[in-house]
Swiss-Prot record:
InterPro entries: CC2-LZ_dom, NEMO_N, NEMO_ZF, Optineurin/NFkB_EssMod. This is Optineurin. It comes from Mus musculus (Mouse). Residues 38-180, 243-278, 307-511 form a coiled coil. Residues 414-584 are annotated as: Interaction with HD. One of its GO terms (biological process) is negative regulation of receptor recycling. A motif (LIR) lies at residues 186-191. Pfam families: CC2-LZ, NEMO, zf_C2H2_10. GO terms for molecular function: identical protein binding; K63-linked polyubiquitin modification-dependent protein binding; protein-macromolecule adaptor activity; zinc ion binding. It is found in: Cytoplasm, Perinuclear region; Golgi apparatus; Golgi apparatus, trans-Golgi network; Cytoplasmic vesicle, Autophagosome.
Amino acid sequence: MSHQPLSCLTEKGDSPCETPGNGPSNMVHPSLDTFTPEELLQQMKELLVENHQLKEAMKLNNQAMKGRFEELSAWTEKQKEERLLFEMQSKEVKERLKALTHENERLKEELGKFKEKSEKPLEDLTGGYRYPRALEEEVEKLKTQVEQEVEHLKIQVMRLRAEKADLLGIVSELQLKLNSGGSSEDSFVEIRMTEGETEGAMKEMKNCPTPTRTDPISLSNCTEDARSCAEFEELTVSQLLLCLREGNQKVERLEVALREAKERISDFEKKANGHSSTEKQTARRADREKEDKGQESVGSEVETLSIQVTSLFKELQEAHTKLSEAELMKKRLQEKCQALERKNSATPSELNEKQELVYSNKKLELQVESMRSEIKMEQAKTEEEKSRLATLQATHNKLLQEHNKALKTIEELTKQQAEKVDKMLLQELSEKLELAEQALASKQLQMDEMKQTLAKQEEDLETMAVLRAQMEVYCSDFHAERAAREKIHEEKEQLALQLAILLKENNDIEEGGSRQSLMEMQCRHGARTSDSDQQTYLFQRGAEDRSWQHGQQPRSIPIHSCPKCGEVLPDIDTLQIHVMDCII
């Protein structure tokens, strides 16, 4: 199947039909004789697919062009912003230089004033400078002491938190045991008690004797013992919770006190720095008196700090004592739980429940251990992060120093080569703009070419529509001609049948007439032929001659002959095939 004729038509842009209208196929353009409707449809589909592909390519090209244009615009905006930043930095640097020059001039003037003064005020100044140095040494000592105390307090806080976690685990175990006991009132309830009530409960717990074992038959006694043990365990749990709350409150208080101490230390440092600066600038006795007052206030504040630190130590010792009491309570509770387990080890169902409880406790212990390991890992990670932060801070400080040095060098270079840099930047920007304009021009040319190809394709689509209309017309003509040919063929067959009938009738008539003429001849020539055998022989001979003559007459008129070219064919089927080929 060749696509050359349609491609030629699409390239020229002319319509494929020179003589449109309803007519025979011989009047159509000769290039369409070799095509079938299926081939034309395939070519139409291919052209539509190519058109769609071209449209998609145009869209992609437009999107790429837009993206490049946006990138160029963003690049130009970034360059503008960088220029503005450089200009702002240069202005700030100039302002800093001016401020530094003013400060240098002021310091020079102050140095000149100090030189003009006598040696006595200089000695007074040196004597006055000794005082802030002593203050600074005292502040540094206090700082070291406070830092050591802070570290010690942090360690104690960590211990308290670990003990708190252990106590919470014990409380959860006790809750599980109480829930497994089956009593309706053994759910975990927080009981807020005052300090006097807690002390009374502790005394009662110490004075109360341990319950003795009873017989396993008496169920009522067992239930009473279980209830009393549950109540006792609830009291112990509430006391443990109170201890934990008190420990948390003390830890919070200690943290607040540490923060206040740090703030006071920072205030002292600021005051010491302020005093040292005032002493360097001025050398008068009034300032010395103020500094004496400040020293007294600093000493009083140091004393208050030491008192607070001692109070904090006392509170920590109290927390430790309470924690030791809680540990003793924990041991007692464990012993009582073991006793209860021994009592309740009679029935197999209770044994199964105990085994399940043991299994759940082991699971919880494993979970607690895993959580502790995770906490340790997190602590190690935090320590590593802290070390990394320290290293990063050191590197940051180094980078800041290098940055300051670089800024100074940049200021010097900008003063020397500002004009050169501006010229080079302008040249580079102009070159980049020229390249961008060239790229835009080339893209515009490509866009124009694509538009031309689109116009050609639209024209080709119009020609394809005309071709489709012509194909429909030709198909209708072909179907009409086929119907007419079928009708003509039917009429020919009917005529052939009529001819055959007429020929038979004619033969019959001729045979009858020949017989009559023979009879007349026989009657006329009866004298000549007397023998009957001779007459029969002549009669038979004449009949044979007539039959031969009548047999030759229908052979002279052929029935199966083409109406267009006159070719004689043996059968009707071959005649139909020949007629279709001859007409087409």
